[in-house]
């Protein structure tokens, strides 16, 4: 029996007559950053939805931290430490960066956040939120409304919010999407540090980032995994080149 923190066992998802993920089996090992790549419409985001509980699988099993979480709702999986970011930034734009993170920190503690209060009035909350912002180079932007931050800053903020939940495994859905070159590089540096602390599942279209970061890469095409292995083995795989990467990746 595998000791992998996350095990996907023959999971499928249908939308009407369309099978979006098809018999996907995959283990995410402790200490690895595992990238999932594939063309648009391959089922990558649906797969993340299934893992996180945002969408229920129609069949198959999802084992997380030794427990079958296949039928658990998203909030319960998050409480267990299976935490995701969203492909579309899900921050509170009118609240400051500090307040966004503070809300997440307080939610982790099980208490409600006062939307009319100020995070700085709660020293422990403030300190925890500022520590996360500092880690992402956002301390100087703590008081800025999140809606006024650059796209790259929002993506960093979103990961900081996810980390406030103290995840055991982090699911990241295209964190580099829409970022500038400099913003992308900062995020890559951040992920290089994060991967030392916890396993990460990364959905990403930026192949340079994928091959720089990933320990293993799985390729999803038409809802099925056609290859899984080291970045170099994926580069060298003729079926992958034909289906997705293109011959120029050879």
Language-model features: where?
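Glycine-rich phosphate-binding loops of nucleotide-dependent enzymes
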Residues: 2-250
């Amino acid at each position: 029996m595998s000791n992998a923190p996350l095990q996907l066992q023959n999971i499928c998802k249908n939308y009407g007559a369309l099978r979006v993920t098809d018999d996907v089996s995959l283990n995410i090992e402790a200490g690895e950053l595992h990238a999932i790549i594939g063309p648009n419409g391959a089922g990558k985001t649906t797969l993340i939805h299934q893992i996180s509980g945002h969408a229920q699988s129609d069949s198959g099993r999802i084992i997380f931290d030794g427990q079958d979480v296949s039928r658990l709702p998203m909030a319960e999986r998050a409480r267990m430490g299976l935490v995701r970011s969203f492909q579309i930034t899900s921050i509170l734009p009118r609240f400051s960066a500090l307040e966004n993170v503070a809300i997440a920190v307080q939610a982790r503690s099980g208490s409600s956040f006062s939307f009319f209060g100020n995070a700085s009035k709660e020293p422990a909350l403030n300190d925890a939120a500022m520590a996360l912002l500092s880690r992402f180079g956002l301390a100087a932007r703590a008081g800025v409304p999140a809606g006024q931050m650059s796209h790259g800053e929002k993506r960093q903020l979103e990961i900081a919010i996810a980390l406030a939940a103290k995840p055991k495994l982090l699911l990241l859905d295209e964190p580099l999407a829409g970022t500038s070159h400099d913003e992308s590089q900062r995020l890559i540096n951040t992920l290089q540090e994060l991967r030392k602390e916890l396993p990460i599942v990364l959905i990403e279209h930026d192949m340079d980032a994928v091959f720089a970061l990933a320990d293993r890469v799985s390729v999803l095409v038409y809802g099925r995994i056609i290859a899984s292995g080291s970045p170099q083995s994926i580069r060298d795989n003729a079926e992958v080149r034909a289906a997705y990467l293109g011959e120029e990746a050879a």
